[in-house]
């Protein structure tokens, strides 16, 4: 039991840093989904596309 507590105390950074990275990637993906839903509803991007023109925001 003491050895487990010592390991946790010494190596907590090795767990929290990757966990923060994964949570950040998840939040970034959710933010991109919300922005994609809003993409062509704003006045800035709401216009007709020219022939052979790609979407305004990917």
Curated annotation (Swiss-Prot):
The lineage of its organism: Eukaryota, Metazoa, Chordata, Craniata, Vertebrata. The gene is NDUFB1. Belongs to the complex I NDUFB1 subunit family. Complex I is composed of 45 different subunits. This is NADH dehydrogenase [ubiquinone] 1 beta subcomplex subunit 1. It is found in: Mitochondrion inner membrane. InterPro entries: NDUB1. It comes from the Eukaryota. The chain crosses the membrane at residues 11-27. Accessory subunit of the mitochondrial membrane respiratory chain NADH dehydrogenase (Complex I) that is believed not to be involved in catalysis. Complex I functions in the transfer of electrons from NADH to the respiratory chain. The immediate electron acceptor for the enzyme is believed to be ubiquinone. Keywords: Electron transport, Membrane, Mitochondrion, Mitochondrion inner membrane, Respiratory chain, Transmembrane, Transmembrane helix, Transport. GO terms for cellular component: mitochondrial inner membrane; respiratory chain complex I. It is a single-pass membrane protein. It holds the Pfam family NADH_oxidored.
